[in-house]
Amino acid sequence: MKQPLVEAMERYLQEQVYPLHTPGHKGGRGMAEPLRSLLGSTALRMDVSLMSELDDIHAPCGCIREAQEEAAKLYGSDACFFAVNGTTGAIHAMLLTALHPGDRILVPRNAHRSVTGGLILADAVPVYVQPAYIKEFGMQGQVTPEQVKEAFAVCPDLKAVLLTSPNYFGMAAEVKQIAEIAHAHNAVLLVDEAHGPHLGFHDQFPPSAMHCGADMAAQSTHKILGALTQCSLLQVKGARIDLRHAADVMSLLTTTSPNYLLMGSLDAARAQLAERGAVMLEDALRAAQMLRNSLAKIPGLHVIRPEDVAGKYGIAALDSTKVTINLKEWGVSGVTIGEALRKEKIAVELVDLQNVLFLVTYADWAPVQWQDTVNRICKTLQKLRPVKNPLEARSVEQVKALETEAAEKEKAQQAEIPVTEAAVPMRTVFYGKKKTVPLSGAVGLICAEPISFYPPGIPVILPGERFTDKIVAWCCLMKKQGLPVSGPADTSLQTVRVLTQE
């Protein structure tokens, strides 16, 4: 399978050119140990500056252009751009390409934090919609087509709709229906497809955003496929999006010193998917099913299945390689289970108050070794399984403490993110004067920094929104349960930054 950029890199390496140019480590000779040995001499020799024979990502006319065209052909888009600043950069590019300052865009409330940055850059106005809440599992589903129709009825001037599909848990939205609704209102559909670069290559997975009519989709090739971390693709259809403008925006946001190892890994991952995609995804399904079957045997654990969510909560289908266990019956938080698994040298993708997510890919499928890993996971979980009656043989004080802890966990698990009120445009807050106040004293003030509990990074409150007593209480509740906070300058959340009101 042709790999235009990788092949050009290999030819350059074979020339044994002496570099009297950047980077300063000169092919690794000047790099400090132990990193030099860990990376290896071949990789370091390919950490080069922009060379005519290796093309220019800002004006591609050779191997990079060909590599991007091959990726577009594979995914069914009209243009594909290598995004070496990850899907964060690709999402920023989508928003800057599709929107003008002041334009309104429908945004799921659980959109990734990168969307906030993109909205500030684009000076666009978000109209938020809360995805359906799955109370049984304590997680959010998807935005429904009905919600999108209602949004256009209230805000007919919406220029775009943004979806996160699939979400962290592999739940795909009704992308085709929502694309049709958006297009009927002369709006474009932008999809954060970070967790779906593998979709469209096996019939047991949800269809891809491009195949469902999306106008742009940002994909994290590194999350599921074989590219290096930080490597993503931006797919664009040209019917409603100006492809030249998209290229200009990508150039604006991309470093003038892109790493060729990163770009080469995108080319290699694309070629691998083109040649072996169906086989790779079959391997991923086998590995996921082995884990699912074993986890399902553990009493009290519920492994979330496609039939639990598909056709409900705005969810069209579930990517079953995202293996999620729900711990509600155990009465233990996902944070606790995640920490215990890490002590056993098992690192998971995501934890929240009720769930633990295992991300399984084709690279996990080596039957004997994978079975050993699955056994380790299940053995650890069996040890953590709560005893049948934890209150037996306890003192009165211990019983009260356990009952209080259980009540607090139940309260946290049932809590939904409070509704917020936008008071000031995000861009105004970004450039405005700020001050720091105790979280307990923030009620009524304008938030000047995003606050998310991460993963999955769903904002509790965003810049420009007003703190309420419910938001402050929710933040305290989540922090007490051990969820790490992301966004504020003070990650202990004792204080928050607010807009100075003059």
Where are these regions (language model features)?
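PLP-dependent enzyme catalytic core of the Aspartate aminotransferase-like
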Residues: A340-K343, E349-E502
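Conserved N-terminal alpha-helix of the aminotransferase class I/II PLP-enzyme fold
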Residues: L44-G86
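A generic structural motif
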Residues: N167, E329, Y362-A366
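Conserved glycine-rich beta-strand-loop-beta hairpin in the small C-terminal domain of fold type I
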Residues: A288-Q289, E307-T324
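Short, surface-exposed ligand-recognition loops at beta-strand->loop->(often short) alpha-helix junctions
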Residues: I325-V332
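Conserved PLP-enzyme active-site core in the AAT-like
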Residues: L5-E10, Q14-Y18, P34-L38, S77, ...
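Flexible glycine/proline-rich, aromatic-decorated loop/lid segments
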Residues: A209, L234-L243, A310, G314, ...
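N-terminal "arm"/small-domain region of PLP-dependent enzymes with the aminotransferase-like
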Residues: M1-G62, P455-P456
